[in-house]
């Protein structure tokens, strides 16, 4: 999200034009039977609600990253209606939306669990920007198992199965950044030095997802 403020043009090029390029490849293929388009839970117009967003809620987004994902969702919906609409011939195409997925192989910038591990390994303090921001944390195997089920259903149902799907934890399992940090450190049996601070000049980030 923060990188999209620095380079919004590339953000839109990748997430919007990248999506349309994939959709065009599917449209011009004779072999694709089903496809899932992975976007994000940030594609919704975020009103800082305490409850989860539904697949029918308005798309949008405050920051360029979220907005670009909303645009990608609109493209997918347009292609579903315009090109992937023949029940007997069209491939099944659906979007799937998940957020704050954690698991092995995650080396991206500004990721809580990798940053916690690095600070523990380097015996350095970890600075967290939004300790009380809540996120729908889930292990990568949870949404991936759902994605596979959606793909299987699309393969069998074709374009009749076209839709959009949210994947996330039960609302009772949603934790703040602070809670996840403390749970992670406790599981390692480590009293890690964590400092929480906010920056008035920091770009907007949603408190509740």
What do the predicted segments below correspond to?
Residues 1-98, 102, 182:
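N-terminal Rossmann-like NAD(P)+-binding domain of SDR-like oxidoreductases, especially those catalyzing
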Residues 22, 79, 115-120, 146-150:
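A short, amphipathic alpha-helix embedded in the catalytic core of nucleotide-handling enzymes
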Residues 47-50, 106-110, 140-141, 177-180:
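Short aromatic-enriched loop/helix-cap "lid" or pocket-rim segments at secondary-structure transitions
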């Amino acid at each position: 999200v923060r990188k999209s403020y620095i380079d919004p043009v590339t953000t839109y090029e990748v997430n919007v034009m990248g999506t349309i390029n994939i959709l065009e490849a599917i449209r011009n293929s004779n072999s694709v039977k089903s496809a899932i388009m992975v976007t994000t839970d940030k594609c919704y117009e975020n009103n800082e609600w305490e409850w989860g967003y539904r697949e029918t809620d308005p798309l949008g987004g405050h920051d360029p990253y979220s907005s670009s994902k909303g645009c990608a969702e609109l493209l997918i919906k347009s292609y579903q209606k315009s090109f992937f609409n023949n029940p007997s011939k069209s491939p099944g195409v659906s979007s799937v939306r998940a957020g704050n997925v954690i698991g092995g192989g995650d080396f991206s910038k500004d990721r809580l669990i990798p940053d916690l591990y690095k600070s523990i390994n380097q015996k350095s303090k970890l600075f967290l920007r939004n300790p009380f921001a809540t996120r729908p944390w889930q292990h990568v195997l949870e949404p991936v198992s759902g994605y596979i089920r959606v793909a299987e259903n699309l393969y069998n149902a074709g374009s009749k199965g076209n839709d959009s799907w949210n994947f996330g934890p039960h609302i009772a399992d949603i934790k703040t950044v602070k809670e996840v940090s403390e749970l992670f450190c406790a599981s390692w049996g480590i009293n890690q030095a964590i400092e929480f601070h906010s920056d008035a000049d920091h770009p907007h980030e949603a408190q509740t997802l």
